[in-house]
UniProtKB/Swiss-Prot annotation:
Keyword Hydrolase included in the entry's annotation: yes
Native organism: Bacteroides thetaiotaomicron (strain ATCC 29148 / DSM 2079 / JCM 5827 / CCUG 10774 / NCTC 10582 / VPI-5482 / E50)
Top-level lineage group: Bacteria
UniProt-recorded name of the protein: Small ribosomal subunit biogenesis GTPase RsgA 1
Known EC number: 3.6.1.-
The gene coding this protein: rsgA1
Length: 355
């Protein structure tokens, strides 16, 4: 761990975070931001260096897994023994990106917090999948994070007309960048879109070049990358942890491991209408609570039938809506159980205090 002076405002520290810290019972202790999440510990950048921190027992056993710290969280910790510490509190999360864990249970996994933008990275080869891009965008918008589609490895050659046609409904709503680390001007345009103090998380499948993009944006090698496989022409999975790096004179970048599946953790399925431009037509539906599935007088269905709304986009909306509905229903039931668990924990604490 390093000993250095860090300007935490470059990492996003603000007056609002300071006020939140004053509410904590641990307000007189050190604070910092988690820059790397390991399996059982965390690297926390503070004003006087980087600390390797663990959690207190109360935090481990008094919280559900999706409330454990994640990369990007601002935490309060007690330093000890030369750049080591114990995390005692987490400041309230904002703009946290989650995904549904694999499996049938509605468990969420926190990927990163205090995120301003999400760079949704796909490579212009066999990895390109507009339906997968829509899935990432849906989750990002749920958390009030700005989605940006980054189509990487443009040097591989692709049918640009076909790509443009596939993403036109995305490009009408969100920024789209075509990039290649072998084409510096494309990296420059992407870098110019990141402002000072802004936090950007990179998400996407394995081998799309997320770590290489982070290195290119920083102008130096800050993350490990792998060579291209000669047999497949694809990058190998490199990132194994969620890691934050600071750009010189600009924002904060968070690299994440590639994912094979990205399950939706959306509480309100109705929010999907905004992403798919369905809300543009929904205003003309006969019923204000129309779900745009089989209701009479549905302007959305009419737009699909007359070709104004792409039927593939509409089918994607239905699929994601069903998935979001199942998650929200399961999440509601799970939260009732968690409330009972929280009451039990508080009761145990009270009993201990009385002994």
């Amino acid at each position: 761990m390093s000993n250095e002076n860090n300007n935490l405002s470059l990492y996003g520290w603000s007056d609002n975070l300071f006020r939140q810290k004053q509410i904590s019972q641990y307000k007189d202790m050190s604070h910092g931001r988690i820059i790397v999440t390991h399996k059982t510990c965390y690297e926390v950048v503070a004003e006087d260096g980087v600390y390797l921190c663990e959690l207190t027992g109360n935090m481990i056993y008094g919280r559900v897994p999706d409330e454990y710290p994640c990369t990007g969280d601002w935490v309060i910790f007690q330093p000890f023994d030369a750049n080591k510490g114990i995390i005692v509190d987490i400041l309230p999360r904002e703009r946290a990106l989650y995904r549904k864990k694999n499996g049938r249970v509605a468990d969420r996994q926190a990927i990163a917090s205090y995120v301003d933008k999400a760079f949704i990275v796909q490579s212009l080869d066999d990895n390109f999948n507009v339906r997968r891009a829509e899935r990432f965008i849906a989750q990002v918008m749920e958390e009030k994070i700005k989605p940006v589609l980054v189509l990487n490895k443009a040097d591989l050659g692709c049918d640009r007309q076909k790509i443009d046609e596939a993403i036109k409904h995305i490009a009408r709503q969100f920024p789209v960048f075509i990039t290649s680390i072998r084409q510096p001007q494309t990296i420059l345009r992407l870098r110019e879109s990141i402002t000072k103090g802004e936090t950007v998380v990179f998400v996407g499948s394995s081998g799309v070049g997320k770590s290489s993009l982070v290195n290119a944006l920083c102008g130096k090698s800050v993350l490990n990358t792998s060579d291209i496989s000669l047999s497949t022409g694809k990058g190998r999975h490199t990132s194994t942890r969620r890691e934050m790096v600071l750009m010189d004179g600009s924002g904060v970048l968070i690299d994440t491991p590639g994912v094979r599946e990205f399950g939706l953790a959306i509480d309100n399925p109705d929010s999907l209408t905004e992403m798919f431009e369905i809300s543009d037509y929904a205003e003309s539906c006969r019923f204000s609570d129309c779900k745009h599935i089989d209701e009479p007088g549905c302007a959305v269905l009419e737009a699909v039938h007359n070709g104004t709304l792409d039927h593939k986009v509409y089918e994607s909306y239905l699929k994601l809506r069903r998935e979001a509905w199942h998650f929200s229903a399961s999440e509601h039931e799970k939260r009732k159980k968690e409330k009972s668990f929280t009451k039990l924990v508080e009761e145990v604490k009270k009993r201990k205090a009385n002994f």
